[in-house]
A protein has these predicted regions:
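N-terminal hydrophobic/helix-forming segments and targeting peptides
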Residues: 1-346
Length: 346
């Protein structure tokens, strides 16, 4: 049976995604975004707990005691100060696995450990076409790039006097836009878009006074981009990751579909769960794709490697240009939400 929900509800998902995309949260620097989500939990009287590893756990009582885990991650790619150069620029080490050439020319903010923030720009070491012969051809990597600070600094001491030191986190401007045609384009849709979908699911259940078939334990993980996000899970029976779907080459997924991942780099997802998701997508008349993601792993992968006795599956809205300037469409978000809702109610 097709789920009927007003289109304005799905537009609200995009707006909430934009809201949380504005809160910097590279892996390892997620306290502020978790505090923001905790405040939402308090306002809506959701049962929650912040775990020692920084993850946020939200519990929703179901019609029985079988426990389904849902997970999505709020951490993003970013960088960290690795050295201060003699000319007052910064060397950096990436956090996660970005397409580093896309960092070239991007605005960023350095967050010191003592409450100060300083803006800057990622640049190649040959940034000026009128000066550097290799401006177009120089490879973009950690050794050939730097950060130019928006302060009057001329040497290492000037930078230290600003309070910047090695180990400070660097967040990129996500540049989020929602277009009249229904696209949302931004860095870090992977995976703040899924966080927005899950929080709107919580809102929907509360508003409709609807209980899921099984008890839900929802984990908002904070270290997925570095591989350990859901390596610890509370006691659950099965686990569904809501993360970005892959788009490109021979894959069937696109920005308007919900992707159901049958296998990724870490191996196949649970056969029965994946089959059930496909059946539900058909029953709900959703626009969906089943794909094998060639260079990918998820919080389900981390949970299994962490020794959790679970079965797991993966779905998500198709996201183009992943780990770069990402984009998806309202239709993909709608299909993902409807599949997630059908999954927890059936």
């Amino acid at each position: 049976m097709e789920t009927k929900i007003d289109n304005s509800f799905f537009l609200e998902i995009l707006e909430f995604a934009k809201e949380i995309l504005e809160i910097p949260s590279p892996s390892g620097y997620t306290n502020n975004i978790i505090i923001h989500l905790v405040n939402i939990c308090k306002e809506n009287k959701y049962k929650y707990e912040v775990l020692n590893n920084g993850n946020l756990l939200i519990e929703v009582k179901g019609l029985d005691n079988y426990v389904v885990g849902l997970t999505c991650h709020v951490d993003t790619l970013g960088a960290m100060v690795s050295a201060i150069n003699s000319d007052g620029t910064l060397k950096f080490s990436v956090v996660g696995g970005p397409i580093l050439p896309t960092y070239d020319g991007e605005y960023c903010t350095i967050y010191t450990r003592f409450g100060k923030s300083v803006t800057g720009t990622f640049l190649s070491n040959a940034p000026a076409i009128h000066v550097h012969k290799e401006a177009r051809t120089l490879p973009r990597n950690e050794e050939t790039m730097h950060i130019r600070l928006d302060e009057l600094v001329h040497n290492k001491k000037d930078v230290l006097d600003l309070g910047i030191c090695n180990g400070d986190f660097i967040a990129l401007d996500p540049k989020t836009q929602i277009t009249p045609s229904g696209f949302i384009k931004s860095r870090f849709l992977d995976d703040k878009l899924s966080v927005a979908i899950v929080f709107k699911l919580l809102e929907y259940l509360a508003k409709e006074k609807t209980a899921p078939k099984h008890t839900l334990k929802i984990v908002i993980s904070t270290l997925e981009e570095v591989g350990s996000g859901a390596s610890y899970m509370p006691k659950i029976d099965e686990m569904l990751a809501i993360d970005m779907g892959c788009v490109g080459n021979h894959l069937e997924g696109n920005e308007e579909k919900v992707s159901i991942c049958a296998k990724d780099s870490s191996g196949p997802y649970n056969y029965d769960m994946t089959t059930k998701l496909i059946e539900l997508a058909k029953k709900e008349k959703l626009d969906y794709a089943v794909d094998v993601f060639p260079y990918y792993s998820s919080d389900v992968s981390a949970a299994l490697k962490g020794g959790n006795n679970i079965k797991g599956a993966l779905i998500g809205s198709g996201v183009a240009a992943s780990h770069g300037m990402e984009r998806t469409h309202l239709n993909g978000v709608t299909n993902t939400f409807k599949l997630l809702l059908a999954y927890i109610l059936n």
